[in-house]
UniProtKB/Swiss-Prot annotation:
This is K(+)/H(+) antiporter NhaP2. The lineage of its organism: Bacteria, Pseudomonadati, Pseudomonadota, Gammaproteobacteria, Alteromonadales. It catalyses: K(+)(in) + H(+)(out) = K(+)(out) + H(+)(in). K(+)/H(+) antiporter that extrudes potassium in exchange for external protons and maintains the internal concentration of potassium under toxic levels. Keywords: Antiport, Cell inner membrane, Cell membrane, Ion transport, Membrane, Potassium, Potassium transport, Transmembrane, Transmembrane helix, Transport. Pfam families: CorC_HlyC, Na_H_Exchanger, TrkA_C. Belongs to the monovalent cation:proton antiporter 1 (CPA1) transporter (TC 2.A.36) family. NhaP2 subfamily. One of its GO terms (cellular component) is plasma membrane.
Length: 574
C-alpha cells in the first residue's frame, strides 16, 4: 500500500466515522437503534450503495469485529454491579446454556425446512444466530431504568452466552467438514466445559492479577486505561488460545475491576466509554461494508420467515423453558426478556467461521445471519421502549446529578464530586445549609450562583438556579439526588408504584378494614414484609409486583436488599 492509498484509506475511514456520529441523533428521533445507523452507513458506502467500495476481506472483518467486541465487553463488565448477580446469575446462566441450545434447535429445524438444507446445516444456521449480542444489548439498555432482575438477566446473559454458541458452531463445522469424524458425547462435553471453565478461571484469575498490577503501578493518569485495555486483551487472547471463551474472560475481567477499588477507575471508565463508541462504529461500519444487499434479495421471503420464527417462537419458548425453575419472574418479565433477544455482531462474526473453513453453502449462512441481525435490530431494537412500557418493567426515572467525577486522592479512592442544579420546586430553596439533613460523610464543597463561586458557610441560603458541587461516595448518591436533583414528574411515581404507600412492618390485620382484605389463620399474623417474601421470594427488587386479593402490590422502596415500603394500586387503577 503506497502513501496515496494510505491517505485515501484514512480519508474514507474518517469520513464514514464522522458521518456515523453526525447521524446518530437521527436514531433517537426515528426510534431505531443507533447500531443500525452505523450498519446502514457501512452498507451505503459498500458495493451496492452510492459509495461503491468493494470490500470482501472476511479475515480483516473478523479481526476488527473481535477486537471491537472485546473492548465493548470489557467496558460493559466494568459498569455491571456485582450486586445484580444476587438476583440474576442463575437465570442468566440458564438462558446462556439451555436457552441457546433450545433456540439453536428450533431455529435449525426451521432453517432446514425453509432452505431445503441437511438437518446438520440447519442446526449450524441455528447455532450461528442462537446467541444474543452483548454489543447490541449493552447499547440499547444503557441508561434505561429497568427492573433490576430483568435488566441484569439480559446483560449477564448477553455477556455469557457466547461460549455455548461458539461451542455449537465450531462442533457443527467440524462435523460438516469431516462427516466421518467421530465426535463422541464425552468429547463434546469436555469441549463445552473447557470453554466455560477456562473462560471463567482466566477471567477471574487474570482480572485479579490485572487489578493488583494496576493498584501497585505508579503511572501517568492516562496510562492506567491503556494498561487495563492491553491487559484485558491479553487475557482475552490467552483464553481463546487455550481453548476457553475469550469473550467470557474479558467480560469477567471488566466485572472484577469495576467492582473493586481500582486506581484511576474513573479515568479508565471515561477512556473506555470513548473506545466503546469507536469500537461500535468501526465494527458495524466494517460489517456493513462486507454485506452485498443484492445477495439478500434471493432469500428475503424465507429469511423473513426464519427471523420472525426465531423472534416469535424459538426465543420465547427457550426463555419460558429456561426460566421455569425461577418463580420470581412474572409473565411480563418473561415476555420482555423474550422480546429483547437482540442479535448483532456476534452472529455475523460466527457466520465468518464457515467462510474461513471453506464449507459449501458458507455464503448462504453469512447472508442469513446478516438478514436475521437486520430484522432483529429493526423490529426488536426499535420497539424496545414500547415493549418495556407494555411489560411494565421500566421504572420511573430516578433523580440524578447533572454530572459526576472521581476525586482520586488515594490509589483506591471512592470519593466523587456530584454536581446538582437546583430547580425552583426543591424544598431546600431559601434554607440555610446548616439546616439541611445531609447524609453522613458528605459535604457541599462549592456553590455557584450566576457564574460566580460562593464560599459556602452554615448560614448560606440556597437559591433556585444554584449549582452545587457535593463531595461524597456512591452509597450516598440516592439520598443526595433526592435532596438536590430535579425530581421526576410527580405523576409518574404514583402511576407506576400506586397511590398508597405502606411500611412493610405494618400488619395485614391493620390493613384489612381499610382495603377489605379477607384474612385467615395463616395470614392474620403476617406483616406486609411477610406477604412480600411469600409472594416474591427472598430477593425482591424495586418495581416487583404481584396481585393479591384483587389489589396490585408493588415494591416501592428498598434499603440494602430489604423491602422498606410497598405501593398499592386499587383494581380500577391497575
Amino acid at each position: 500500500m503506497d502513501a496515496d492509498s494510505i491517505n485515501s484509506f484514512f480519508l474514507i475511514g474518517a469520513l464514514l466515522a464522522a458521518v456515523s456520529v453526525l447521524l446518530s441523533p437521527v436514531s433517537s428521533r426515528l426510534g431505531i437503534p443507533i447500531l443500525l445507523i452505523f450498519l446502514a452507513v457501512g452498507i451505503l458506502a459498500g458495493e451496492d450503495g452510492p459509495g461503491g467500495i468493494l470490500f470482501d476481506d472476511y479475515s480483516t472483518a473478523y479481526l476488527v469485529s473481535n477486537l471491537a467486541l472485546a473492548i465493548i465487553l470489557l467496558d460493559g463488565g466494568m459498569r455491571t454491579r456485582v450486586a445484580s448477580f444476587r438476583v440474576a446469575l442463575w437465570p442468566a446462566l440458564s438462558l446462556a446454556t439451555f436457552g441457546v441450545a433450545i433456540t439453536t434447535s428450533i431455529t435449525g429445524v426451521m432453517a432446514a425446512w425453509l432452505f431445503d438444507l441437511h438437518w446438520l446445516q440447519g442446526l449450524l444456521v441455528g447455532a450461528i444466530v442462537g446467541s444474543t449480542d452483548a454489543a447490541a444489548v449493552f447499547s440499547l439498555l444503557k441508561g434505561r431504568s429497568l427492573n433490576e432482575r430483568v435488566g441484569a438477566t439480559l446483560e449477564i446473559e448477553s455477556g455469557s452466552n457466547d461460549p455455548m454458541a461458539v461451542f455449537l458452531t465450531v462442533t457443527l463445522i467440524a462435523i460438516l467438514a469431516n462427516v466421518d469424524a467421530e465426535l463422541s458425547v464425552s468429547f463434546m462435553l469436555i469441549s463445552f466445559i473447557k470453554q466455560f471453565g477456562l473462560g471463567i478461571f482466566l477471567g477471574l484469575g487474570g482480572g485479579w492479577l490485572l487489578w493488583k498490577l494496576v493498584n501497585l503501578s505508579k503511572l501517568a493518569e492516562g496510562l492506567y486505561s491503556i494498561l487495563v485495555l492491553s491487559g484485558g486483551l491479553m487475557i482475552y487472547a490467552a483464553s481463546n488460545k487455550l481453548g476457553g471463551s475469550g469473550i467470557l474472560s474479558i467480560y469477567l475481567v471488566g466485572l472484577f475491576l469495576g467492582n473493586k477499588p481500582t486506581r484511576g477507575r474513573h479515568s479508565i471508565l471515561n477512556v473506555l466509554d470513548g473506545m466503546t463508541w469507536v469500537s461500535q462504529i468501526g465494527m458495524f461500519l466494517v460489517l456493513g461494508l462486507l454485506l452485498t444487499p443484492s445477495d439478500l434479495l434471493d432469500i428475503w421471503l424465507p429469511g423473513l420467515a426464519l427471523a420472525f420464527g426465531m423472534i416469535l417462537f424459538a426465543r420465547p419458548l427457550a426463555v419460558w423453558l429456561s426460566l421455569l425453575p425461577f418463580k420470581s419472574f412474572s409473565s411480563r418479565d418473561r415476555w420482555f426478556i423474550s422480546w429483547v433477544g437482540l442479535r448483532g455482531a456476534v452472529p455475523i462474526i460466527l457466520a465468518v467461521f464457515p467462510m474461513m473453513a471453506g464449507l459449501p453453502g458458507a455464503q448462504l449462512y453469512f447472508n442469513l445471519a446478516f438478514f436475521v441481525v437486520l430484522v432483529s435490530l429493526l423490529v426488536q431494537g426499535a420497539s424496545l421502549t414500547t415493549a418495556a412500557r407494555l411489560a411494565k418493567v421500566e421504572l420511573p426515572p430516578k433523580p440524578l446529578p447533572i454530572s459526576r467525577s472521581g476525586v482520586e486522592i488515594y490509589p483506591s479512592s471512592e470519593w466523587e464530586v456530584f454536581v446538582y442544579h437546583l430547580s425552583e420546586n426543591k424544598w431546600c430553596i431559601g434554607e440555610p445549609l446548616k439546616r439541611l439533613s445531609m447524609p453522613d460523610g458528605t459535604r457541599i464543597a462549592a456553590v455557584f450562583r450566576h457564574n460566580t463561586l460562593l464560599h459556602p458557610s452554615g448560614s448560606t441560603c440556597l437559591e433556585a438556579g444554584d449549582i452545587l458541587c457535593v463531595l461524597g461516595q456512591e452509597k450516598s448518591l440516592e439520598a443526595l439526588s433526592n435532596l438536590f436533583s430535579q425530581a421526576p414528574e410527580t405523576k409518574e411515581v404514583p402511576r407506576f408504584f400506586g397511590d398508597f404507600f405502606i411500611d412493610t412492618e405494618v400488619k395485614l390485620l391493620d390493613l384489612a378494614p381499610i382495603y377489605g382484605l379477607e384474612l385467615d389463620e395463616a395470614t392474620g399474623d403476617m406483616t406486609v414484609a411477610d406477604l412480600v417474601a411469600a409472594e416474591l421470594g427472598s430477593h425482591p427488587v424495586l418495581g416487583d409486583q404481584f396481585l393479591w386479593q384483587s389489589l396490585h402490590w408493588v415494591v416501592a422502596g428498598l434499603n440494602e436488599g430489604k423491602v422498606t415500603n410497598v405501593g398499592i394500586r386499587l383494581p380500577a387503577e391497575a
